[in-house]
Regions:
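Hydrophobic pocket/interface hotspot
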Residues: 29-33, 39, 61, 78, ...
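Short N-terminal secondary-structure initiator segments
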Residues: 53-73
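Hydrophobic ligand-binding cavity/cleft-lining segments
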Residues: 2-56
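A conserved amphipathic terminal alpha-helix motif
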Residues: 119-159
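Hydrophobic-ligand binding "helix-grip"
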Residues: 40, 66-111, 119-121
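Hydrophobic residues positioned within well-ordered beta-strands of beta-sheet architectures
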Residues: 16-18, 59-61, 74-76, 100, ...
Length: 159
């Protein structure tokens, strides 16, 4: 049973659960988060981001992360309902499991509640030891990064 507990601890499922009310309209924040192609232009850790396909409200996107001299890619299938939700599912990458969703709730014409729920598990202990601290810090700050960029876009529209 001791070994089992150790296994559980090492291969635990990791969760991100964040929500913010922001003074940005729903369409701006949804479009920003749904446009995987644009990530590389404002997320400092994102070396490359590509939309491989966008058919019937399902985007296959690939993100390349580069941080602390470590590079890796992962690919997700993102099924979306415009201005409502984006559901993420792992297609390929160093995870045994990754899925989650973004939800968008219109408060009024100028304010939106944005939430991200993500759960993930790495392929093996070695990968987890090298990638978990980086991925965890990225995912814990990703909502803030999107919000900052949404405010920049909003301010550009106003000038």
């Amino acid at each position: 049973s001791c070994n089992f507990n150790l296994y559980q601890r090492i291969y635990s499922v990791n969760y991100i659960d964040k929500s913010e009310d922001i003074n940005v309209d729903i369409s701006t924040i949804f479009t920003l988060i749904n446009n995987v192609d644009g990530y590389k232009s404002f997320l400092p850790w994102c070396k490359n981001s590509t939309i491989i396909s966008n058919i019937d409200n399902i985007i296959i996107g690939e993100i390349e992360i580069s941080k602390n001299l470590i590079n890796w890619k992962f690919k997700t299938s993102n099924s979306y309902i415009k201005d409502k939700t984006i559901k993420l599912e792992l297609v390929d990458g160093p995870f045994s499991h990754l899925n989650g969703e973004w939800n968008f709730k219109k408060k009024d014409n100028f304010n939106t509640q944005v939430s991200l729920y993500l759960e993930y598990q790495f392929d093996n202990r070695i990968i987890e030891m090298s990638l978990k601290p980086i991925f965890s810090s990225i995912m814990n700050s990703i909502l803030d990064s999107f919000i900052s960029e949404a405010f920049r876009i909003k301010n550009d529209k106003q000038t």
